[in-house]
Structures are given as C-alpha cells and as structure tokens.
C-alpha cells in the first residue's frame, strides 16, 4: 500500500480519446532532463539557431561541452539523416536519455531503466510465464514489443530467439542484453518511421549510441529488498584508448547477479498435507512467486580507424551470457496424471496389467516417494541465453557534398531451456529428474549502402537527400530436447503424463530451420525551406521472400512560430513483417487421452500447414499502420522547456492466434490420403493469423526546469506524462475472444507519470523521483461476458512509487551514491484467485500461494536499498 499518501485510489475521469479529439490537443513528449549533445556538428555546418541553456547533468558534473541538462540545441541522429538536426528543430518527438540518468535507476536491466526514464515505455514482470520470466515483454506506446525498432549506433539490432506468447506472439529485441557501461545515451524516436528504417518501426525507434571516448569509468553496486531477499550485484567498466592519431578503441564489460525473491503464501494443498503430517513439504512455501535468480556477463566493443583523409573504418560488436531460474507450479504427491491415474477402473485395470513389473511395483508402493518426491515437487525452470553480434563498415565522403556508408552486420541469439526437480511421469521408476527441453536460435544478417547528398538549392540550408538500400536474411531454428523431455513412456497407458512435467520438450516434429530474404530501397529528403520552416519526405519499398512487398511513405514538417516555439507534425504509413519464427512456429504437446488407449496432440502449428489451410490458414502478411502526430516544443524561459505531442496509430492485419480447431474423421482421412501424416492423432490446434485491427491514441508531455539557486547550486525539476489508449476496431471471426480483447485494450496502465527533483550543490546531489501508474486489468477474477461466457479479470488501481538517492564525490575521480527504490515499500492490490463465480460472490481470498498479480506492469517486491560506487578517469 502507498502508506504515507492517500493517493492510490485516484481515478482519471478524462478519456484519452477526448484529449486527442481536437487540433489543439496536447501530448507529452519525454524530453529527458539530461539531454546532451548527440554528436558534434559537421565541419562548416551552420544549423538554424535553437534555444540553449546552461546547467549540469545528474550527479552535478557539468557537460564537457557546456550543454545544459535540458539543451534543445543538442544534435540528434535518430529520425533524421541530416547531420546538424537538433531536438528543437526536429519534426518528430525525440527523447535523449543520458548515461547518468540511466545509472540513477538501480536495476541492472535496461528495460527497467527505460521504463523509469521514458514514460511511454513499459515492461511487465511475469513471474510464472515460461520464457517470459526472463525475456520480459517491453512496449512503447502500449503496442506490441516487436512493433518498436531497436538500433545500435544506427544499425538494426538482431531479435531475441524467444517468441512471447503472452504478447500475441511477439518476437522482439532483448534490451536486457545491452549493458549500461557501454552506453553513451539512448535516443527514443516516438513516431512511425518504417519509411525511413523499414519493418518494426510502427511505435517508434530506440537508438542506443555506444561510448567511443578515451579514459576509463566504472561502477560497483549492491542492494537488497526490504524483505531481506533478492540481494543483487552489478559491476561494470568502460575503457577507451586512442589508436595512434587515426582511431579509437572502446571496451565495456558488465557482470550482474541477483537472488530470487518470494512474495508468497503457502499453497492450500501443501498446507493441508502439512496438517496431515507430511514432513517433506517445503517451508515456508513450496512455491516462490517473485523474481528469478539471475546471472549475466556482457562484453561490448566499439572502434574506428581512419584509412585516409576521407575514409574511415568502423566496427562494433557484443557477446553476452544470461542465465535465470525460477519456480513453476507445485505438484502435490497425489497429483492426478503425475502420481495417480485419472482413468476409470474399467479402463485402468486392463491397461495396468500391460505394464512391466517394475512399473507396477512403483505405482503400487507410493510412486511419489519412490521418485524422490514424498512431499511432491516444484519444478525449477531455467533459461541460458548466448548472444553475439558484429557490425563492420567503411564510410567517408566522395565530395564535400556526398557522404557514403557501406556496412555489414551479423547477430544471433541462442536460448537453451532446462527444467529440474521434476519428472516424466510416463517413465515411472525410470524417469530422469532433470531435462534439457530444447533450444531456440535467431540469426540475422544484413548489408547496407547509405548515401547522403547535400543539394544546394538557394534555400535557408542545402537540401539533404539521403538514399540507399538494404539486404537482409533471417533464420529461425528450433532444436530438440532430451528424448525423455518429449516422449511418452510405458506408463502413458494408465494416464500418466508424458514429457518433462512443467515444460514439454521440443520433439523432432517441431524442430527445424526456416529462413527468409528481403531487399529494400529508400529515399529520405529533408529541406529547410526557410530558417523557421522545414519539410521532410521519405519513401521506402521492401520485398520479403515469404511475405510479399510493401511501400511506405512519410511526410513531416516543422514551423517556427516564434524564436522559442516550434510546431511539428508528421503523417506516415508503416509495417511489420511477420518473422520466420512466427510464420513457422510449431509448439505442440502430447498426452494420453482419458481412456489411456490413444495419444492426444494439441498445440500451435504454422498457418501454411495443410491442416491449417483446411480451416482458413494462409501465409502471414505484414501488419500495416497509419500514424499521425502533432505537437510543439518551446522554451519560454532560458531554463524552462516544454514539449507536447498528440498521436494516433491505426494498425491493420495485426497478428494473433486463431481459435482452437479440431478435425473431423472425414477431414483427417482426406488429409492422410493427400500425404499429410501429421493429421493422424491431431486433437486440437490453432495458428497465427492476420486477424484484427486496432487504434492507439494518446498524449505525451514533458516539462523541464533547471532553477539556479546560487553560484554552486541548482534544482533540476522535470515532470513527464504519457496517456495512452488502445481499442480493438474489428477482428476476424474466431480470433479474438473477450479475454484476448481485455489483454489488447487494458493489460497496461493508460497513464504513466514521472516527476523528479534533483538538488545539486557543488559535487553533491539529492534526487527524488515519483512514478505513478494508472489502473489496469489482469484476467483473474471470474465474471461473464454479454453472451454468458466465463472470462477472468481483476481491476487494479493506480499506484505511486517514490525513489530517493544521494551522492557526493569522495575524491576527484570517485563518487558514492546511496538510495532506496520504492522508498515507502508500496505494494499493488492483492490479487483474487477464486475458481468459480460462486467463490467470487462469497468473497475471494488469495490461493495457490500467489499474493500479487502475475502480469503486473511494475515490480511487486516492495522497497529496496542500494549503494553504488563509481569512478571516472
């Protein structure tokens, strides 16, 4: 609960739609309070005048170039290919989040850092959702995780191998693979940009700029939650050297580890066994609901070298290892289909007689104890991720007006899944207790040629004409697990489940490798018609070997109404091509039928499978978007900046899972006769379809004020707000049910607010940050829809969290910071878990040991304290 304040039940009464209805509606764009120079202006460049300020960065250390913490004259490289475009003169909203501000968030996960510094960015914490425990779905403007393009130094980053079935099958970049030590700043373009960058840039673009300077810096941080668990460590170092007079080499490394947390009660079935005298039940809880145990090590390199006066070689890359482990659902020692048969006696008896004698003895003499689990078991699920990337290129200028850049890139993510302290019940006394359940791998390769021409046309500035092409190849692979992780053993005939219990292994019928190629060409024109009026036009054509062709365009403009006030707006079309993984995913499991005489196969199959085609499955097409934004940026006072933008994003043909189908005997016979053996025994299935259309609209605003308080002191104040709402406009029959609709429209807060105050005096500083999230819904509490069908949801109210930190320079090069995240130990509402509508009416109580919601858009582990030591030479 929000103990010191009575604010958590506040409700917003003005809808996002109403705010977005008029021409003058405002939307808050998060211009970070620590915006800094993105790059030096090109030699000889003369950008249009922009407001500038003076100030200090977080931590009280002045910027090297004297730029202030809310510097609208900072040059940005995202959303434009003009080398002198500033934040103030940009035609689209851009956030620039500096390394110091990211460091003020104690979490070592980049997703958490961006969530607390960019209000329109959200990441969920999912303690019980298979791979999503470790690959957490992150969203920009409430859209799908893979509808945001991620770049490193302006080059496309490869995807994770994980396909997140909790987020409509999204396959996105894993931002947790990118360490703070390597980052100079993060630029977040919150506008459609597919016409400039290609697939995925529907919600926007996150461009991570790596450090490239000389010297060394680093940090060591330790912390723990107020509850006494979740101890965590984070350490990173960055070092840069000159390579003679022509180049530079910069290396970054980071190590992190974290112990698990538990915010749980004892499960009722375990408590009942304890009361009956079972001394083997784990206490205080058999199952932990909380954060996983984690370990990670990441290395980044960034280098440049001048080959001549007009040619430069550059390269950057990374390698990473991430491991995590968490509890799955508890299985009690009398669990049906695990230790006891669910078959009726007339079926069980004849089947039992066919078992080998060792299996019969095992079943008749306490199978739980003989398997090593007299108190039942809680499977421990883990994932090991190996990540690698490399980008290399050459760039230069053919003339003073023509720049060129030729590059190639490679990226891969390999995930291994394991489960232990479990069994394959169908193998009875011969079952292993730990399993390798399979692998997933995503590999991306690409090559780019980009040219930039400065065309003199007698305008305020030369017209910037950028054009180029891109070729890409993507490969998705599924590898098999241990045979015992997916096979059904002899005891399957008596109704005991096959496969590794808790997480079914990948079998040969699911494994495979799928690839696709794509080529693209683009033109991007940026013209300053006058000093105060600019226009941008971009177009891109792209062809995919498996998803057809698409052409997209963008028109943007900026109008300087006053010297300190710019209006801006953009209209664009966009797209996201389905990934090879989504187009070819096979995720099935096998278990005995209730009669024990046959095997049931259920799961997800590719939409192009002949079985899917029988039910309307076709090759997936790209999702298509239409994006409109309008806003302003202003600096009414020397130290005060304000920006606001309203947006609307319509997305058609969004990809989702179909309803579940079954085959009639006649359909099975026809498929078998046409050479489709997989139809044999397929009980039920679904597949991905381009099935629904949505509209997302909202408002982004930021206010930043750097207030001088004397010669050595100042107060940095910022307030940022995001209002965001998604509605389902239409859906194909059988694709979206009531529960899925709730997930699309209401799984995330429609409001996120961040307010921070940083007082700086000399080398000492104190930072207070407040984070508020609006209400949201999780599918847990049984209700019925208009048709009387049972659906599950529970509404959770707004929450506010306070963070406090203080730091000072111990020496010229060393700094100490101590702080508390979630200072007042606030927790969300407790979740209700009734199993029936009658239970809900009678008053729900926590059950199954879970106390807090399992799909929360913020942590539910309470407050934590930490200390951090940093150095900079």
Where are these regions (language model features)?
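N-terminal periplasmic "start-of-domain" segments of outer-membrane beta-barrel proteins
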Residues: 71-107, 132, 161-167, 214-216
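N-terminal periplasmic accessory domains that precede
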Residues: 110-113, 117, 138-139, 174-176, ...
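Extracytoplasmic beta-strand/coil segments of soluble accessory domains associated
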Residues: 115-159
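Short acidic/polar hinge/loop motifs at secondary-structure boundaries
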Residues: 155-190
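Transmembrane beta-barrel wall of Gram-negative outer-membrane proteins
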Residues: 227-375, 379-393, 397, 804-805, ...
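Outer-membrane beta-barrel transmembrane domain signature of Gram-negative proteins
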Residues: 379-385, 390, 399, 410, ...
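Gram-negative outer-membrane beta-barrel transporters
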Residues: 467, 641, 645-782
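C-terminal beta-signal and adjacent terminal beta-strands/loops
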Residues: 651, 772-783, 808-873
């Amino acid at each position: 609960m929000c103990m010191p304040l009575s604010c958590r039940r506040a409700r917003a009464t003005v809808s996002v739609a109403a705010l977005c209805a008029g021409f003058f509606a405002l939307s808050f764009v998060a211009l970070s309070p620590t915006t800094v120079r993105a790059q030096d202006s090109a030699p000889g460049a003369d950008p249009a005048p922009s407001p500038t300020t003076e100030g200090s960065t977080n931590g009280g250390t002045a910027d090297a170039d004297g730029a202030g913490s809310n510097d609208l004259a900072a040059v940005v490289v995202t959303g434009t290919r003009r080398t002198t475009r500033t934040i103030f003169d940009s035609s689209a909203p851009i956030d620039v989040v500096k390394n110091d501000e990211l460091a003020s968030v104690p979490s070592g996960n980049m997703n958490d850092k961006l969530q607390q510094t960019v209000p329109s960015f959200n990441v969920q914490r999912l303690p019980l959702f298979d791979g999503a425990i470790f690959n957490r779905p992150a969203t920009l403007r409430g859209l799908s995780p893979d509808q945001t393009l991620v770049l490193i130094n302006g080059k496309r980053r490869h995807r994770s191998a994980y396909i997140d079935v909790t987020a409509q099958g999204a396959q996105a970049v894993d931002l947790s693979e990118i360490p703070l030590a390597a980052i100079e700043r993060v630029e977040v373009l919150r506008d459609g940009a597919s016409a400039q960058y290609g697939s995925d840039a529907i919600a926007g673009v996150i461009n991570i700029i790596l450090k490239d300077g000389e010297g060394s810096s680093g940090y060591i941080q330790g912390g723990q939650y107020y509850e006494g668990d979740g101890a965590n460590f984070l350490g990173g170092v960055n070092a840069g050297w000159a390579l003679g007079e022509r180049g530079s080499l910069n290396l970054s490394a980071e190590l992190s580890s974290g112990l698990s947390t538990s915010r749980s009660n004892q499960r009722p079935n375990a408590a009942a066994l304890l009361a009956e005298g079972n001394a083997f039940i784990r206490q205080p809880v058999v199952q932990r609901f909380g954060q996983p145990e984690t370990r990670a090590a990441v290395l980044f390199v960034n280098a440049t070298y001048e080959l001549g006066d007009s040619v430069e070689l550059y390269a950057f890359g990374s390698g990473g290892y991430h491991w995590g482990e968490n509890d799955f659902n508890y299985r009690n020692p009398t669990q049906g289909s695990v230790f006891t048969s669910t078959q009726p006696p007339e079926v069980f008896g004849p089947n039992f007689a066919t078992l080998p004698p060792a299996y019969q003895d095992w079943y008749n003499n306490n199978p739980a104890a003989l398997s090593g689990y007299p108190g039942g078991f809680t499977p421990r699920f883990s994932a090991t991720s190996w990540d690698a990337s490399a980008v290399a290129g050459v760039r230069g200028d053919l003339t003073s007006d023509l720049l060129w850049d030729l590059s190639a890139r490679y990226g891969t993510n390999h995930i291994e899944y394991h489960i232990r302290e479990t069994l394959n019940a169908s193998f009875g006394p011969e079952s292993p207790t730990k399993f390798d359940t399979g692998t997933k791998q995503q590999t991306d390769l690409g090559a780019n040629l980009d040219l930039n021409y400065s065309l003199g046309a007698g305008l305020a500035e030369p017209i910037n004409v950028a054009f180029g092409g891109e070729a890409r190849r993507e490969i998705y692979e599924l590898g098999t697990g241990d045979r015992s992780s997916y096979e059904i053993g002899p005891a399957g005939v008596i109704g005991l489940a096959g496969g590794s219990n808790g997480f079914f292994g990948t079998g040969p019928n699911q494994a495979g490798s799928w690839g696709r190629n794509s080529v693209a060409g683009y033109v991007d024109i940026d013209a300053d018609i006058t000093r105060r009026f600019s226009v941008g036009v971009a177009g891109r054509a792209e062809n995919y070997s498996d998803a057809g062709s698409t052409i997209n365009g963008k028109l943007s403009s900026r109008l300087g109404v006053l010297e300190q006030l710019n209006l801006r707006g953009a209209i664009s079309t966009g797209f996201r091509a389905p990934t090879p993984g989504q187009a070819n995913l096979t995720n099935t499991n096998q278990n005995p039928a209730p009669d024990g005489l046959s095997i049931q196969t259920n799961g997800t199959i590719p939409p192009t499978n002949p079985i899917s085609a029988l039910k309307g499955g076709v090759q997936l097409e790209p999702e298509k978007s239409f994006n409109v934004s309008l806003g302003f940026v202003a600096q009414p006072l020397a130290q005060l900046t304000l920006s606001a933008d309203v947006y609307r994003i319509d997305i058609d043909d969004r990809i989702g899972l179909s309803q579940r189908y079954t085959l009639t005997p006649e359909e099975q016979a026809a498929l078998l006769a046409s050479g489709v053996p997989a139809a044999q025994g397929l009980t039920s299935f679904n597949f991905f379809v381009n099935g629904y259309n949505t509209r997302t609209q909202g408002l982004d605003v930021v206010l930043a004020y750097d207030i001088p308080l004397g010669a050595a002191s100042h107060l940095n104040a910022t307030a940022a707000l995001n209002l965001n709402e998604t509605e389902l406009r239409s859906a194909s029959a059988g694709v979206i049910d009531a529960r899925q609709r709730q997930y699309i429209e209401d799984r995330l807060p429609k409001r996120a607010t961040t307010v921070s105050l940083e007082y700086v005096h000399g080398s000492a500083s104190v930072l207070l940050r407040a984070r508020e999230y609006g209400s949201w819904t999780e599918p847990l509490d049984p209700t019925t829809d208009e048709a009387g069908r049972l659906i599950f949801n529970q509404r959770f109210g707004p929450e506010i969290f306070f963070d406090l930190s203080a730091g000072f320079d111990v020496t010229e090069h060393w700094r100490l910071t101590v702080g508390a995240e979630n200072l007042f130990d606030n927790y969300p509402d407790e979740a209700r878990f009734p199993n029936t509508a009658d239970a809900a009416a009678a008053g729900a109580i926590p059950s199954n040991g879970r106390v807090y919601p399992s799909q929360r858009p913020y942590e539910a582990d309470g407050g934590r304290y930490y200390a951090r030591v940093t150095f900079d030479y």
